[in-house]
């Protein structure tokens, strides 16, 4: 696919699609709640539609209209055995959280996905769930999908110190803990996104959060809700960076989710001297949302690492692009988790941006980016990773000497089906 190149800047207002993490979880909690859940501004992208498909296969009635998704909950014990394997496509969130949701059911399940999912590590979820009494294994006894879950296992409480900072692992344990006897205690390594915890409370459940320690009791009942999903800050990040690095730009992003566990990119933009203002903030779905305004800016390099990394892990590819347009060196460290995303994002970012003229060195746990560098025409690939594909489209906006051809552009539909249309709507 030939990407959009434009040196004239981007001007206008857009509303980014609903938050991907919250869209997944709204279906999951709606399914195990009693009564009806109505979800507005749901992310209708491949990953989240895969979650809907999986719960329909488990006997949950889900209606889809133009404006909303309506989930008719089965209650905490009402899921039914699927007729065949659950195919969750490309969604790491779906497979890992479903492992927790299905760990204590009275039926067997097989969960599989695409070739990317088949390469992603699952022991980080499987081992703590097995410690709770779940029986599950990967293909041929490995940790890789397809994952087979054996039913009719009683789950017991656990105190668990997480070895990695992962909201997916934490959420899988929480979902399993809801089916276990007693109180499960989870100690996080670093603070990660907390949508699951907040949604438990929103659906009428109880959970204690004290710093890095979470306590959740089993046997809880949930009540269906009406909710509006705020815009995904990870999707907004591409337009934030586009507005900062394309000369003459000013972009307003409305109804963006402002959960503090997700807004690390705002802190980085401030460190680098970028113009980013948040206004009109309000509560939506129990979460803060607001309008984010960005303008083209002169940027300087910075160092990014430590406990901010879980707050911006999905934004690192586009932050790396931002750093190519900053004066000086930017160092990103403590981000080895990038190696086990849809692709090895450390290598993918360095390989593809270097093709375009960037000066980036990959490291074991991050990137060293030397700026400021002009970007040039090239043939690039997304590696089938939606965030790499969208980052490369933003990079292409700076190219003046020819075309940028993107291979595997279809990956973008995993999280943002209207991405290219929204870019075009902002062209001067």
UniProtKB/Swiss-Prot annotation:
GO terms for molecular function: 3-phosphoshikimate 1-carboxyvinyltransferase activity. PROSITE patterns: EPSP_SYNTHASE_1, EPSP_SYNTHASE_2. The keyword Chloroplast does not apply. 3-phosphoshikimate binds at residues 20-21, 25, 166, 168, 314, 341. InterPro entries: Enolpyruvate_Tfrase_dom (IPR001986), Enolpyruvate_Tfrase_sf (IPR036968), EPSP_synthase (IPR006264), EPSP_synthase_CS (IPR023193), RNA3'P_cycl/enolpyr_Trfase_a/b (IPR013792). It is an enzyme of class 2 (transferase). It is found in: Cytoplasm. One of its GO terms (cellular component) is cytoplasm. Phosphoenolpyruvate binds at residues 20, 92, 120, 168, 345, 387. Pathway: Metabolic intermediate biosynthesis; chorismate biosynthesis; chorismate from D-erythrose 4-phosphate and phosphoenolpyruvate: step 6/7. Its EC number is 2.5.1.19. Belongs to the EPSP synthase family. One of its GO terms (biological process) is chorismate biosynthetic process. Disulfide bonds: none annotated. Catalyzes the transfer of the enolpyruvyl moiety of phosphoenolpyruvate (PEP) to the 5-hydroxyl of shikimate-3-phosphate (S3P) to produce enolpyruvyl shikimate-3-phosphate and inorganic phosphate. The active site is at residue 314. Pfam families: EPSP_synthase (PF00275). Keywords: Amino-acid biosynthesis, Aromatic amino acid biosynthesis, Cytoplasm, Transferase. Its main location: cytoplasm. Monomer. This is 3-phosphoshikimate 1-carboxyvinyltransferase. NCBIfam families: aroA. It catalyses: 3-phosphoshikimate + phosphoenolpyruvate = 5-O-(1-carboxyvinyl)-3-phosphoshikimate + phosphate. Gene3D superfamilies: Enolpyruvate transferase domain (3.65.10.10). Transmembrane segments: none annotated.
């Amino acid at each position: 696919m030939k990407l959009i190149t434009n040196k004239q800047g981007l001007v206008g207002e857009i509303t980014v699609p609903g938050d991907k993490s919250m869209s997944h979880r709204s279906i999951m909690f709606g399914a195990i709640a009693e009564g009806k859940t109505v979800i507005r501004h749901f992310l209708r992208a491949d990953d989240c539609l895969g979650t809907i498909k999986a719960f329909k296969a488990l006997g949950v009635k889900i209606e889809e209209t133009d404006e909303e998704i309506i989930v008719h909950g089965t209650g905490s014990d009402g899921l039914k055995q699927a007729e065949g394997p659950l195919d969750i496509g490309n969604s790491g969130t779906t497979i890992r959280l479903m492992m927790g949701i299905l760990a204590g059911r009275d039926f067997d399940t097989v969960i599989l996905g695409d070739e990317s999912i088949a390469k992603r590590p699952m022991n980080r979820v499987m081992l703590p769930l097995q410690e709770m009494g779940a029986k599950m294994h990967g293909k041929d006894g490995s940790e890789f999908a397809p994952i087979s879950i054996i039913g009719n296992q009683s789950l017991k409480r656990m105190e668990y110190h997480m070895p990695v900072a992962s909201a997916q692992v934490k959420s899988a344990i929480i979902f399993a803990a809801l089916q276990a006897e007693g109180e499960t205690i989870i100690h996080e390594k670093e603070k990660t996104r907390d949508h699951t915890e907040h949604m438990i409370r929103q659906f009428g459940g109880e959970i204690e959060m004290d710093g890095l320690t979470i306590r959740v009791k089993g046997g809880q009942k949930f009540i269906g809700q009406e909710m509006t999903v705020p815009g995904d800050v990870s999707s907004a990040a591409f337009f934030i960076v586009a507005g900062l690095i394309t000369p003459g730009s000013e972009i307003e992003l409305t109804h963006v989710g402002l959960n503090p566990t997700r807004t690390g990119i705002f802190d980085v933009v401030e460190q680098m001297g970028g113009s980013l203002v948040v206004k009109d903030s309000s509560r939506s779905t129990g979460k803060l949302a607001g309008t984010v305004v960005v303008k083209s800016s002169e940027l300087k390099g910075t160092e990014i690492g430590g406990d901010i990394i879980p707050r911006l892990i999905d934004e690192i590819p586009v932050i790396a692009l931002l750093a190519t347009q900053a004066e000086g060196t930017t160092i990103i460290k403590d981000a080895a988790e990038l190696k086990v995303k849809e692709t090895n994002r450390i290598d993918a970012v360095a390989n593809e941006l270097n093709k375009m003229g960037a000066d980036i060195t990959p490291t074991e746990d991050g990137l060293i980016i030397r700026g400021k560098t002009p970007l040039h025409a090239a043939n690039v690939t997304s590696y089938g990773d939606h965030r790499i594909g969208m980052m490369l489209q933003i990079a292409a906006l700076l190219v003046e000497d020819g075309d940028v051809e993107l291979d595997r552009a279809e990956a973008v539909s995993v999280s943002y089906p209207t991405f290219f249309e929204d870019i075009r709507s902002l062209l001067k």
